[in-house]
């Protein structure tokens, strides 16, 4: 297949969740012999620096810078016109013209737009079938942000964005030939009929994230991982350090906490410094940081879709303590393949019990790894998506043949 791929950030193997997903998809499609043509934005946050690796996976690659001032202007302009701010912030006229030219010049077999932020570039019907990879219910994520952010102005902004996105998601989905989300929970939150959307979850690299030959010591650290400048993870760190970890230390003074991830925000650095826990920023390998960990934690309250940090920890053979929001869509059995905790007190108690019981911790970790190997490899999910892509292309080709035959 010849596929035109649109992304709101340059794909990156080790970047944010959306960047990693598109990178892995391009990697899979290239290995399968498909011809991918990438058009992406390079936003103001500098995300996606390993462009050479991306270029190797694509027949062509066009990247368009999107500065902070431009994003703010187009975001506000589009918001006043009724569109979500995030859709406007990722609108770039030069990219729009390039997409139009490529549709005419390449005549792709398929168009794949990743996230609603890229939907407007190919909203109008094209000769090739169009897939909108919605991935997560942004409305669900925004609702949780509006409820849990500490800053009043932030809560007001997210409430306004929530109203716009709640209208936009089902409307834009109906404009595309096919839609994908990563879980039934996201599908239902958007309000999409069960038969109108493909379920295409994320995956995890089980070669990179794997159990270590030597078991972690009983005093090994508890680990939290993720991009440390996103609202989702900043709020999780705040909850962990203010409400959960003090309870753990009160019971187990020897316990250690390690927070790992790229781009820690100033607020994360302040919280870590006050709490006196370990911070490993901008690490080369999250997997290596998990090697000697005893337990992984995911105290997410602001989240939608799937949490890669949970999949990675489970693949590494770690027992994971997670909130219901962090386990959404994964399907792990609570108490068997992961530990569910719905309050700060219960979360702390679960961590204490696992640190105090190495045998139970190892048993949960072994079952978690087996679960990931069965259900959550990238290859498993991408092969299903590829099959659906091929069917969509074949169906479109048959329709065109039938149309020509009638005339």
Feature-to-residue mapping (PLM):
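N-terminal subdomain of nucleotide-sugar transferases
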Residues: 1-62, 104, 250
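Acceptor-binding helix/loop patch of EC 2.4 sugar-transfer enzymes
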Residues: 8, 68-88, 131-170, 227
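Donor nucleotide-sugar binding/catalytic pocket of nucleotide-sugar-dependent glycosyltransferases
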Residues: 131-132, 139, 158-211
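Conserved catalytic-core segment of nucleotide-activated headgroup transferases in glycan assembly
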Residues: 174, 199-292
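Acidic donor-binding loop of glycosyltransferase active sites
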Residues: 177, 291-305, 316-319
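Short hydrophobic beta-strand element within catalytic cores of glycosyltransferases
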Residues: 309-312, 319-323
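Conserved acidic donor-binding segment of nucleotide-sugar-dependent glycosyltransferases
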Residues: 338-345, 353-358
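A short, well-ordered alpha-helix in the C-terminal region of glycosyltransferases
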Residues: 360-374, 381-384
């Amino acid at each position: 297949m010849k596929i035109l791929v649109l992304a709101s950030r340059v794909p990156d193997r080790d970047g944010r969740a959306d960047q990693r997903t598109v990178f892995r998809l391009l990697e899979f499609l290239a290995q399968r012999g498909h011809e991918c043509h990438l058009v992406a934005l390079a936003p103001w946050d500098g995300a996606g620096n390993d462009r050479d690796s991306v270029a190797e996976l694509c027949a062509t690659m066009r990247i368009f810078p999107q500065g902070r001032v431009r994003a703010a202007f187009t975001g506000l302009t589009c918001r006043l016109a009724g569109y979500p701010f995030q859709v406007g912030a990722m609108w770039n006229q030069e990219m729009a013209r390039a997409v139009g030219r490529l549709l005419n010049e390449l005549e792709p077999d398929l168009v794949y737009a990743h996230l609603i932020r890229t939907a407007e570039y190919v909203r109008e019907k094209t000769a090739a079938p169009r897939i909108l990879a919605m991935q997560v219910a942004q409305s669900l994520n925004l609702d949780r942000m509006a409820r849990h952010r500490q800053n009043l102005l932030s809560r007001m902004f997210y409430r306004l964005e929530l109203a716009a996105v709640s209208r936009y998601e089902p409307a834009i989905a109906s404009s595309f030939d096919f839609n994908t989300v990563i879980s039934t929970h996201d599908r239902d939150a958007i309000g999409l009929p069960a038969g109108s959307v493909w379920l295409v979850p994320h995956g995890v690299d089980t070669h990179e994230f794997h159990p270590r030959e030597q078991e972690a010591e009983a005093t090994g650290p508890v680990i939290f991982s993720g991009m440390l400048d996103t609202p989702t993870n900043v709020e999780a760190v705040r909850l962990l350090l203010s409400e959960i970890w003090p309870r753990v230390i009160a019971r187990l003074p020897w316990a250690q906490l390690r927070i790992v991830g790229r781009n820690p925000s100033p607020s994360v650095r302040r919280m870590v410094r006050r709490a006196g826990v370990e911070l490993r920023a901008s690490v080369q390998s999250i997997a290596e940081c998990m090697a000697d960990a005893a337990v992984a934690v995911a105290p997410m309250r602001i989240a939608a879709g799937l949490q890669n940090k949970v999949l990675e920890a489970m693949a590494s053979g770690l027992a994971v303590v997670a909130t219901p929001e962090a386990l959404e869509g994964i399907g792990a059995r609570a108490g068997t393949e992961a530990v569910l905790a719905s309050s700060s007190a219960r979360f702390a108690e679960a961590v204490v019990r696992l640190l105090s019981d190495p045998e139970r911790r190892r048993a949960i970790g072994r079952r978690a790894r087996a679960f990931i190997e069965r259900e959550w490899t990238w290859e498993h999910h991408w092969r299903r998506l590829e099959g659906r892509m091929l069917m969509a292309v074949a169906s479109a080709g048959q329709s065109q043949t039938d149309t020509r035959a009638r005339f």
